Amino acid sequence: VTVALMWEARAVAGRGGELLDWARRQTLAQEPMRRETFRAPQDRVLVVTWWDAAYDADLPELPEPDGSLVTRTVHRWRFEQVADAPAPG
């Protein structure tokens, strides 16, 4: 099963670049199959990691950044991959 972990944080206004640099520097205890980092307006950063694991597996996640860098606690989501529906017809 492929599991995707999503980690999203919002930096204090004008500090999105610092948050992005911080997220890129974070290492995990295990290497995921894939890791991608995104940015968005309002100084937001998203990191998605993909794992070959059960949905409820104990997987390493990025920590909370220093409170002076972010406006709120990190949002975290976990998803499992499902097969695409067959094309109609």
Where in this protein do the model-derived segments appear?
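Short amphipathic alpha-helices within nucleic acid-binding modules
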Residues: 17, 52-61
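Soluble, non-membrane globular domain cores that form compact, hydrophobic packing
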Residues: 2, 27, 57-60
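Short amphipathic alpha-helical segments
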Residues: 11-34, 62-65
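Signature tryptophan residues that serve as conserved aromatic anchors
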Residues: 7, 50-51
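Feature marks short, surface-exposed loop/turn motifs that line or immediately flank catalytic pockets
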Residues: 13, 41, 54-55
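Short glycine-/aliphatic-rich beta-strand segments at the starts of folded cytosolic domains
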Residues: 2-11
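Glycine-rich beta-strand-turn "strand-cap" elements at beta-sheet edges
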Residues: 1, 33-46, 62-89
